[in-house]
Amino acid sequence: MSIVYLVSITFIFSVFKPITSCRVEECAAWFQKTKDYENLVPKATERYCQVLQTYLKCMNDTQRYCHGNLRFHSSELIMRRHWKEFECEKWESCNDNSHVKRKHVNTCYFNPPPSNRKLKYCSLFGDPHLIMFNGSVQTCSEEGARPLVDNRYFLVQVTNRNVRGEALTTTVTKVTVLVRKHNCTASLRYEASSDEEGLPRGFVDGTTFQMTSKHSVEVLWQDDNYVEIALHFIHSSIHIRRQGPYLSVSVRAPTIVLETGGDVARELCWSGCRKSSRIPAELAVEMTKKFAECYRRRVHVPKKVAEDRCKDIGNIGVFFDACVFDLMFTGDDYLVHLSRAAESDFRRLAPHHFQSHVTQQHARFQKENQHKNHINQSEIFKKCIPSKSIRFYPFLAIFFFALLSLLC
């Protein structure tokens, strides 16, 4: 009976174990990258103390998950010695109740402007199509909420749902941006939903910017269909567009900012869509009938008509392909305008990456076309609609608890 009990408890805890863990590696990585990026050396300077303070705050936040972690305790001890040795407390803001005049510190430091090579760009638009940080392009069909980008400074979460009632036809209907508390900003939240009449003009608390010597964060509202959330202190920006019942979102940020995140496997911009939800959009356009039958999709617009329409608005490359796919299988001109806006944003926000992206995609398409005649078309579209997964874990847990009650 004791063996059964132990096995059961072990199983249950393995299923429901918490996902939290010690983030000492993440804190150390951020600290080291910031030092390297700014050429900081350990000495009694205001900037080094400010970075050290942020590092110690990171360590303090993860302390309860690091009991018994030798690296955590040794690193924290060394850094606290630095804090004391360099008299970093003198750089802290003075107490409002104190009558002793101390040097007041401006704790908000803007990062140096990054070069084009150190900028990353990611975009999600249409039915939906994903351009990842590495330049890869995917077309997916996922429902529910998932982080697009998640790091120490901000989180962008997208919610996809089916708005047309057709199989595997999803699009972005909600974008949530969380700006995390930092020396340059308080915690801020922005929410955009396709159900609303237009994009909000500010954060949910009613503010539109964070005041420092210059605005560190601000909402740059253009009109009901386009808004930019600018994080000036880290040279990052989030761009949200709206067309009818659809939203699109793009993120531009330096690599050093993006790499302060934790589990990048969950982020769409880094790891992409789940394999089970990816759709071969290029083949779908070429083999329309087989795709439509396998994915239970209706062809709303003939291929030639869709191509002419997308050429008329000036789309090229992957944006042309996305436009054709969306128009063929939805017939919705709103998505045509979103693909055009997505291309325009890419050109404007990351021109260096846009040119290399077009070149790489052209080379990839040429290679794919060389092998297209060798593809066994009968093997491409099979079992396209995944069966609904059954979640066994809760039922198994209940079963084991019932078994324990009978045996004890």
Curated annotation (Swiss-Prot):
Its subunit composition reads: Interacts with unc-40 (via FN6 domain), dbl-1 and sma-6.
Keyword Transport attributed: no
Family in the record? Belongs to the repulsive guidance molecule (RGM) family.
Swiss-Prot/TrEMBL keywords: Cell membrane, Glycoprotein, GPI-anchor, Lipoprotein, Membrane, Signal, Transmembrane, Transmembrane helix
Q: Which GO terms of the molecular function aspect are on file?
A: coreceptor activity
Membrane topology field: Lipid-anchor; GPI-anchor
When the coding gene is removed by deletion, what phenotypic consequences does the entry describe?
Answer: Smaller body size compared to wild-type.
Give a yes or no for keyword Cell membrane in this entry: yes
- What InterPro entries is this protein classified in? RGM, RGM_C, RGM_N
Chain ranges sitting on the Extracellular side read: 23-387
Residues spanning the membrane: 388-408
Query: One GO biological process from the UniProt record?
Result: BMP signaling pathway
**What gene, per UniProt, encodes this protein?**
drag-1
User: Which species is this UniProt entry from?
Assistant: Caenorhabditis elegans
Enumerate the Gene3D superfamilies for this protein. Answer: Mog1/PsbP, alpha/beta/alpha sandwich
User: Found in which tissues?
Assistant: Expressed in pharyngeal, hypodermal and intestinal cells.
Q: Which GO terms describe its cellular component?
A: plasma membrane; receptor complex; side of membrane
The job of this chain, per UniProt, is described as: Probably in association with the cell surface receptor unc-40, positively modulates the BMP-like Sma/Mab signaling pathway through interaction with both the ligand dbl-1 and its type I receptor sma-6. Regulates body size and this may be through modulation of the Sma/Mab signaling pathway.
Q: Name one Pfam family in it.
A: RGM_C
Protein name per the record:
Repulsive guidance molecule B homolog drag-1
Residues spanning the signal sequence: 1-22
Kindly list every residue the record annotates as glycosylated: N60, N134, N183, N376
Q: Where in the cell is it found?
A: Cell membrane
